[in-house]
């Protein structure tokens, strides 16, 4: 009986691995650390910030989760320039109007955004690097979270 329970616990993981292998040929899942928001009194990225580690495969997708459920989340990537809003000011994708999905392309970076997650699409090795998300609360305090992406 105990052996049967252990087998049933592993079944979802085995099925997921088989599905990924059959559909994609490879399967890369994973964050190794959870993202944490870091308070920044001086509006700069904190020097002691810890990044959540994510990995992806070329031509695959990766989803950064754990973003604050606010429309003022911003993406600041060290690979490019400046601050860009990821969930505002861009044309809405055709489709389900109940979900706030947006898409924007710049410097080979394509993504879909909702209010609490960001999915990078069609990954290339150029997308590897650190991604910082900045949020400002009602008291004008800045918070940052960091994601370190490795694409191989």
Swiss-Prot record:
Keywords of this entry: Early protein, Glycoprotein, Membrane, Signal, Virion
Signal peptide range: 1-25
Subcellular locations according to the entry: Virion membrane
Entry comment on modification after translation: N-glycosylated and possibly O-glycosylated.
GO cellular component: membrane; virion membrane
Sites where a glycan is attached: 48, 53, 61, 69, 108, 112, 122, 139, 148
Membrane topology (UniProt): Peripheral membrane protein
Similarity field: Belongs to the RL11 family.
Protein known as: Early glycoprotein GP48
Species of provenance: Human cytomegalovirus (strain AD169) (HHV-5)
């Amino acid at each position: 009986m105990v052996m049967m329970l252990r087998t049933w616990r592993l079944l979802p993981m085995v099925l997921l691995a088989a599905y990924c292998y059959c559909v994609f040929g490879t399967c890369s899942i994973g964050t190794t650390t959870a993202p944490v928001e870091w308070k920044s009194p001086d509006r700069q990225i904190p020097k002691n910030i810890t990044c959540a580690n994510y990995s992806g495969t070329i031509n695959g997708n990766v989803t950064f989760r754990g973003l604050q459920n606010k429309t003022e989340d911003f993406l600041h990537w060290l690979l490019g320039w400046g601050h860009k809003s990821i969930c505002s000011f861009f044309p809405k994708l055709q489709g389900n109007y109940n979900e706030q999905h947006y898409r924007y392309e710049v410097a080979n970076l394509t993504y879909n955004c909702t209010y609490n997650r960001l999915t990078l699409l069609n990954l290339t090795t150029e997308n590897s690097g650190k991604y910082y998300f900045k949020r400002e609360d009602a008291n004008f305090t800045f918070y940052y979270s960091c994601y370190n992406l490795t694409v191989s």
